[in-house]
UniProtKB/Swiss-Prot annotation:
GO terms for molecular function: nuclease activity. This is Putative pre-16S rRNA nuclease. Its EC number is 3.1.-.-. It is an enzyme of class 3 (hydrolase). Could be a nuclease involved in processing of the 5'-end of pre-16S rRNA. It is found in: Cytoplasm. GO terms for biological process: rRNA 5'-end processing. It comes from Syntrophus aciditrophicus (strain SB). InterPro entries: RNaseH-like_sf, YqgF, YqgF/RNaseH-like_dom, YqgF/RNaseH-like_dom_sf.
């Protein structure tokens, strides 16, 4: 089963894709946000191209585990995306993935000016890999919810 991972942001959406066995996530692309129609069109094209059956979208819980205003935006986007594409969209905790992605790029010697486009797709791959690891260890928590819940 191919799964697409998304790191949703106001200006960009990082995109990652898992391998056909569902074991590893790879950074794929960064969508520069222009409009809902543009965003969903690009994501729909990726879903068709890679025969994606599910999307995992980062859910930005606060460090204390509570939901903030950005969570509401992700829920709205995920619900609209699920309705438009007709495949499940699962929210998955993304706490500190962007910070981790920035640290990885820094340690790899990527100059700060070149990180902007890469950090989002790398964060998406970290979110998706976390989800894949939980599946493989059968540790999907009961509170992992899809876009229709909450």
């Amino acid at each position: 089963m191919r799964i697409l991972g998304l790191d949703y942001g106001e200006k960009r959406i990082g995109v990652a894709l898992c391998d056909e066995l569902g074991l590893t996530a790879q950074a794929l692309t960064t969508v520069i946000r222009k409009s809902w129609r543009n965003d969903v069109g690009i994501i729909a094209s990726l879903v068709r191209t890679y025969d994606v059956e599910k999307i995992v979208i980062g859910y930005p819980l606060r460090l204390d585990g509570t939901e903030g205003i950005q969570c509401e935006k992700v829920v709205r986007f995920a619900r609209r995306l699920e309705a438009a594409l007709g495949i499940p969209v699962i929210r998955w905790d993304e706490t500190l993935t962007t910070k981790e992605a920035e640290e990885i790029l820094s340690r790899s010697g990527v100059p700060p000016r070149k990180r902007r486009g890469v950090v989002d797709r790398l964060a998406a791959s970290l979110i998706l890999q976390s989800y894949l690891d939980a599946i493989s260890q059968e540790k999907i928590p009961s509170d992992a919810c899809d876009a229709n819940e909450s």
